[in-house]
Amino acid sequence: MQVQLTNRQQHILWATVRHYIATAEPVGSKALVEEYDLGVSSATIRNVMGVLEKSGLLYQPHTSAGRVPSDSGYRIYVDQLITPSLRDTTRTEVLAKEVESALQQHLQWEDWSLEILLQGAAQILASLSGCISLITMPQTNTASVRHLQLVQIETGRIMLILVTDSYETHSKLMDLPPARSETKPDPEVIDRELQIVSNFLNSHLRGRSLLEISTLDWSQLDREFQSYGEFLKNSVAELAHRSAAPAATQIMVRGLAEVLRQPEFSQLQQVKTIIQLLEEEQEQLWRLIFEEPELEDTHKSKVTVRIGAENPLEPIRTCSLISSTYRRGGVPLGSVGVLGPTRLDYESAIAVVAAAADYLSEAFS
């Protein structure tokens, strides 16, 4: 979400979010004057908060109450306000070191095993973030690519078909790349182009793990077909990861008791739906947290933050999910994440998730 805020609006939104995260109480201008050195009067803060409310970044839960951040307000906070000028970098660095130190200490006193490593990581992640921690088991025996084919279904519409080594078939329907559909090319020309791109995919991916698809170097595709490469890159990776979910998706879950003490989870029915998701619908959750973000450097962990209604799974549309992928040799093996109320400490959660993903990547390398 791109919203242009003045420096004053940024600082007041930042202070409002930080105060609400800390107190779970609607925030008024008086509290901000007392707690933060914003350099403006209470009346000015009220006016700015009114502007932020009209922009959809804050709202009043009750007429007489202060204001709280909306999902959009949290999104601006995460994307634009957690920057070196506003972020407590020392604090996040300390948290990252705590994760690494705690994991090293945990392994020092235990006989090293995969289960012990991941259980320890899940518990440490929950303790440091105050959230539910989620860690997927590494996918070491995934299916591989047998064949990929692009087929023209009708004018302007194509289908990507993936066949695995076990002959499972997966498909994705999509429009032609805009650069090709705008010129209204002859269908026979499109068929030939799709076959050339299909040949490229098969020559580079046949026999490789589905999880390796994200490492494909699309720059090797002939220049005249680069419009397909740019368009298909995410679609091919998305289809592969959607197909890679194992029959038994195991997710280690820790920290449930702690996070359910938060006021946001006071409704019993909401708690039940979250527990049901964690216990009975792990495949849906696995697919969500194992979605692969586009990375420039596949050896570094990128943290994905989904806030409130950005989550496609209904039971957690009032929660925030922060996740990252751990890898071996640049190939994704599994994911780590934390789940909590939208009113969570994003800086801490992002720091510990990134640190845990990096540590596990090193452990598996």
From Swiss-Prot:
The record ties this protein, via InterPro entries, to: GAF-like_dom_sf, HrcA, HrcA_C, WH-like_DNA-bd_sf, WH_DNA-bd_sf, WHTH_transcript_rep_HrcA_IDD
Instruction: Kindly state which keywords UniProt assigns to this record, in alphabetical order.
Output: Repressor, Stress response, Transcription, Transcription regulation
- Could you tell me the Gene Ontology terms of the biological process aspect for this record? negative regulation of DNA-templated transcription
GO MF terms, alphabetically ordered:
DNA binding
Which cysteines does the record link by disulfide bonds?
A: none
Organism domain of life: Bacteria
Query: What is the annotated role of this protein in its UniProt record?
Result: Negative regulator of class I heat shock genes (grpE-dnaK-dnaJ and groELS operons). Prevents heat-shock induction of these operons.
Q: Which HAMAP family match?
A: HrcA
Q: Its family?
A: Belongs to the HrcA family.
Task: Spell out the protein name for this chain.
Answer: Heat-inducible transcription repressor HrcA
